């Protein structure tokens, strides 16, 4: 027998042989720590505080770092990293190959960051990896085939990146345990590998929003555990394989927006008992919907719109008691006989139905009364673009849950049912282009949630009902092309929300345009053409500061064009033709830079036609039928304007000369008397100067600017003109002279003085002095004198007017980031660190000025607001100045009248960031109507980023590409992507979601640090701007 001591010795020795030494484990753990630190060093931006804890070292200290999870202490390898979870940590840079050394890693989640570069093939060494989550980044390149080596993967999410190339077949051949595969929103191409049919454990499968082509492999029918399959938004063709219809476990199936065709098999839904959602929209399917659809009793959403389905709509839908949404629009369904509408009676059994879209088919005949018996949960009912006749069911008001009702483009006749007034939740009512008649029911005024009401192109008669003034949420009103008469109700213009459109054109309306129209400060379109309107064009139209389209032609309007229309800086189209207007064309119209279509023809205008602005190109204006006009550009072929006394030989010269001399003498005496009276009344110039800014006299400014000579004019706006001048021998200054004839200019002057009274910051334009006096004609005179900025505005550098300027003015990426940092520091001071919080309200490239050292200074505080507790406006003198900011830069909440806040400045700053990176103005003429600068950049980030970046910055990167080392090029590209994402983050629609100034400064400093050394000092020691 073996003695007990000997037995214990053998057991202890065996244990020592089997267990690794602690020093070995410590060495492996140290390797994990090094791999993590290498990953951190590869990042351009480390997420602010996200990786702040990653700076301690020692035995197992890395296990305490944020996002790092190590094995349990009781296990054999307690300090080995098993999870790295850094989702939504604001990380930017590349994924370091060193992560492939974390050999015990089971979960890697880097989703929702700003990572770029390619997926390192070294990740294939992670043999224990079960979850790989890299979604919502900017990762490029292809999916490495080596990923197939991670054979224990159960979830692979690479969605929402910029991946290209084909899907590796190795995913299907090797990853047998995969249950979730998400590759959507990339740029993947080629065919779907048939090997993916081997993933028999797959439950979630999403390849949508790619460029995949070819047929759907029949092998996908082998995915017996599949719950969700999404192949939508690709270029797939052919038919849906029959094997797919046998996936009895399937709960959601989408192939929308492809090029698929063929018919749905008769027994397609026979085994799909668990199917809840099917989306086959926008393809080329044809034939009938099989009655077997009733077998899929769990169906809640059916989307088969945008195909070529035809015949009678099956009654099988009515047996789907869980159905909530049914989209059949844009097909070839028809109702030849009244019985063909029987499916509506069947659908009354679907008590959960919320959406029914039958628009754009060949449905005809009269609507059955059973429509009024559909579910009261129905919120969306669309019947537009069919051939439906007869009356609208009188009890349609029973559908009390309706929020959207589309009846337009049919042949409905009769009157609008008064029961519509019971639809208290209705937000959109479209009934235009029918044959409806009678009066518009007063009950429409009960629809207080209504946003859009379009009843145009019918046969309505009578007056516009005054009850429309109850629609306090209305955004758009269309009543055109009817037989309406009477005046336009003034109450209509008390609906402050009306902003998209008012169209009352082509009726028989009479009377004048109410002065109250000026209340609609956010209105974009006003159509009142082809009526019998008379009287003058109201001056108050100038208060509609967002107006872009104004149509008043073919009326009986008289008087002159109010100069206040020149305040509509966003106006694009103005048509006043065929009226009885007279007088001179106001020069203020020439100041509307956006105006590209101006029709003043067939009126009685006289005098000289301007030659600048909208009048500088004959293609955009029409003035025929005005016999007494003269001047203008040569292309208009108008007679030359004659001097007043050119034909003096026809008049008795001596009597007129004596009379004129006497009159001038009298006027001169009166003028001197009035001037003396004003001076004695007002005394010396006002001493209400800003604290610390002594006043300067009018005569000093006249001398400083050479009498405000045109050669010293730097620019002009609606509130004032800016001149270059010298107050003493050495100091150049910029003198802003207020146009006090504009009533808002004085408010601008007051706002600017109040905002900058106690402000001191290196990135704010400094006020040298002010002038509040009278000029040499005895009129009030106000001016603000600033430090002169010799390098002009940022706008001049980003958008040079000539090629010569473009060659001379080039800002490289480092300089652009520095300027953005300067502006961010200015905003941070205004919002958080000044004597009192100030909102600038007009951040844009033309208000960012550059000094001789290219340091940026924020200027023009004419719209600024001072806040109490950061939110409440106390600068009431500017509250009546109308729309806040500049179109394109102004925050969306300002468009609906919300109060100014620091969030609005952040939005404008975000747009400025996008402008400075793309070189595009926010209102660039190349943008489609539905595409703004934000959407333009978002498309670029989901495609080729270089397509949206300023070409000059691309050239900077290409200079590095020509070198032997392309690492700087990659760093530049990553910083550009980072900047674009920052701009999008700052300009989010929800104000509270926008990035605060402190975080902006942190990110810009990090970007600037990563760019350091890439843009060296040029010869002579001057920076390459």
Swiss-Prot record:
The active site is at 842 (proton acceptor). This is Receptor kinase-like protein Xa21. Binds to XB3, XB15 and XB24. Receptor kinase-like protein Xa21, processed: Interacts with WRKY62/XB10 in the nucleus. It comes from Oryza sativa subsp. indica (Rice). Undergoes protein cleavage upon X.oryzae pv. oryzae protein Ax21 detection, thus releasing the processed protein kinase Xa21 chain. Autophosphorylated on serine and threonine residues; these phosphorylation prevents proteolytic degradation. Glycans are attached at residues 55, 90, 101, 198, 235, 246, 295, 322, 349, 373, 435, 446, 470, 483, 503, 580, 599. Residues 708-979 form the Protein kinase domain. Its cofactor is Mn(2+); Mg(2+).
